[in-house]
Amino acid sequence: MDPLASNSPDTVVLAGGGTLGEAWMTGVAIGLKRGGGPDLTMAGQFIGTSAGSIMATMITGGTPLERRMQRLSGDSDIAGAEVDPTYTRIGREPGRVRRSAAGLAAMAGLALLGPGSRFIRRAFLRRIPEGRHDLGRLGESIDRLGLSWNGRLRITAVDLESADRVVFGNEFTDSVSVSDAVLASCAIPGYFRPVRGGGRTFVDGGVWSFSNLDLAGSGEGRTVICLNPAGTRVEGVPRLRAAITAGAIRLLSWLEAAKLRRDGTSVTVIRPNAEAAVAIGPSRMDSTRLEETVSAGIAQGLGLAESLGQRFSPA
């Protein structure tokens, strides 16, 4: 689909990265718009993975970014209904969820191995114990948006049995609701329960790739902006392994972007700058850092607004 405004990209890709990843991405989008840069909410298409699927759904469902910011930063009385039930539980089991997140990152890095990675990924998924928690309260929040598959929204997940990627919005539109697709995309293996739909079982889309940027579509003159909070060190993982995993995630994202660029697509990938990385801290699931992470994202977006605004200004 074409963008809905002349200063917006054709496609916005919103990657995984936990609750703080969503907070940072929301802040960046707000900062870009406030500073006169591209309006990400008016993109023609959104591709969301894990936390990015929440943000993509909120945007296409009509939730203003400023309102989402208030919910994430706790300034609204409904913040607890969407953030705390999930991430308060995570805070009580930091070791378990960080191990799950580290495993997720490792599986995403497997894509660098090529076609054989599918078999390794499937073996990994079969060895991971089924998660004990669910994201039902998040599903209720998505349901209240009343959103159907409208052509603008794509959400990624991975089939638990085959370890293949699925793209809701391209497939399963008759058998999987938008809310179930979001829950599937956020179902971190080993922590959250897998999500069933259309006769199949799904887990976090980040198992395949934290951004799934390659789905953005390519072609001469197309424009893509990817907000990617992933690729930083995960707390609780040995330093060397963490560095290797983070490097693999960044390399995979670079390869995905390079493929689009070879076909003539303009791709802009935005990652947390130094200040935002400090705000996010060592764990992307730390809900006590939401407000400062949103603020850091806004500041980063404001800093990028002028240069990106020139790139996306009407001819």
Q: Which residues are covered by each model-predicted region?
A:
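Patatin-like phospholipase
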Residues: M1-T49, I54-A315
